[in-house]
Amino acid sequence: MDYVNPHHFVTNCISGKWKMTILHHIHHYGKIRFNETKKTLGVSEKVLSQQLKELTHDGLIERIQYNTIPLKVEYILTPLGEDLIPALDILYIWSVRRLASLNLPIDPDAFKVHTEMKYEDQLMDIMDTYKHKQHPEADANENVSHQ
């Protein structure tokens, strides 16, 4: 019997430039449609299609096709996909903290789907620290105005 390494397994499920973003997008909006997601995320049709197929294959999302004209397809999280969201949130918080510590620019659009109250305080603290590193003159002005 060949054993499967759990780290490799989960990494395979979420590897891909857009998979974690897609999962959070679905979690935030409840469901997504292909063209809206392509436009919102700015991802190519080919890449989005492939990522959605892989996420569906791995059981993290479900593709729902409506027999309408024109054809309507939506994607929702499965219970397995929902179970993964807290772990992705932890990775996201770590990543934002790390980017801020490296003083790297953080995509503001990435915050749109990460505004749940349980993480908002952490994100705001990190962003405040990040902004102070980016604009130290704002701290000096703030200190002067409070005196």
Protein language model annotation of sequence segments:
Residues 25, 68-70, 105:
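Conserved beta-strand edge residues that scaffold enzyme active sites
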Residues 56-76:
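Beta-hairpin "wing" of winged helix-turn-helix
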Residues 2-47:
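N-terminal helix-turn-helix DNA-binding core of bacterial DNA-binding proteins
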Residues 9, 21, 36, 72, ...:
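Amphipathic alpha-helical recognition patches that constitute DNA-binding helices
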Residues 51:
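Residues within the DNA-recognition helix of helix-turn-helix
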Residues 41-43, 54, 104-106:
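Juxtamembrane/interface motifs at transmembrane-helix termini
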